[in-house]
Amino acid sequence: MIIVTGGAGFIGSNIVKGLNNLGIDDILVVDNLKNASKHKNLNRIKFRDYIDKEDFNLDYLTSFVNNNKVEAIFHQGACSDTMETDGKYMMKNNYEYTKNILHICLDKKIRLFYASSASVYGNGENGFEEDEKNEYPLNVYAFSKYHFDRYLNKLFKENKVNSQVVGLRYFNVYGPQENHKGRMASVAFHLFNQIKAGERMKIFEGSENFLRDFIHIDDVVSVNNFFFENPNKSGIFNCGTGNAESFVEIAKALKEVYKSASIEYIAFPDALRGKYQKYTQADLKKLRAAGYDKPFMNVNTGVKKYAEVLEKSGGYLM
């Protein structure tokens, strides 16, 4: 059996679908459906069972792995709101919870794949190579991810990791199944909906200078599957395309699909000043050295592919 935490979420549900494509459906989905709209993310994926995240505590997980043959855990569940200001909640949910899962996996030799984040690099002034000297988180969400990565790296250095553990530092992910994310959904999602509402696409002033590494969810799933199929490879890896493109390129891609669409530039919000990554670009040397050699979609290709899904199914897997 495989456990996917956050399995009703954006990345988690796509990972379940990716496992389905490998012929695997003996999956336990862990999530919280307090936001009931997330149930739509489960409609087109196959899994054996579901449990609420609040019930999936340390005691439950310990008992479950003692009574079931668990091959791997894809830990994608976390608070991903970069504007969350409750540091105690963030550290308990993202750091302590992940640490508990890690130690159960190490004890039982269960393979662990978990979601880290490119936000650990802060403003990126030192680059985006997987090295502690490059890491300087700008908010408490990023710090929670950074702190767990540091904890794991210490275990690696002490030779205390005796089973596969892979952390993937996701860059700016977009694609199907993110409808429930609200303000945290991708720029592509929001711009598409503005077009459909008859509005102009709204992007921040200076967006042509804001360069991000935008990665389509299908590429994220492909990287996860690569490590799942290569159990001898462990470590923390960047998961981006290796190319930085501007927010304007997203708008241009949508404009190629919706010819009448236009852009409106809006003021940059004060609430984001000093907490906003203006530039991200994954360094892929470590990922490529691990053997992942597939190409990544650029913004133009990926956004058009996403727009097709948004048009046909409202943004859900088909």
From Swiss-Prot:
GO BP: any one term: ADP-L-glycero-beta-D-manno-heptose biosynthetic process
Binding residues annotated for substrate, in chain numbering: N172, R183, H190, F204, E205, G206, S207, R212, Y276
Cofactor note: Binds 1 NADP(+) per subunit.
Name of the protein described by the UniProt record: ADP-L-glycero-D-manno-heptose-6-epimerase
This protein's encoding gene: hldD
GO MF annotations, alphabetized: ADP-glyceromanno-heptose 6-epimerase activity; NADP binding
Cofactor: NADP(+)
EC id: 5.1.3.20
Amino acids binding NADP(+): 10-11, 31-32, 38, 53, 76-80, 93, 145, 173, 181
Pfam families: Epimerase
Lineage of origin: Bacteria, Pseudomonadati, Spirochaetota, Spirochaetia, Brachyspirales
Reaction(s) the record says it catalyses: ADP-D-glycero-beta-D-manno-heptose = ADP-L-glycero-beta-D-manno-heptose
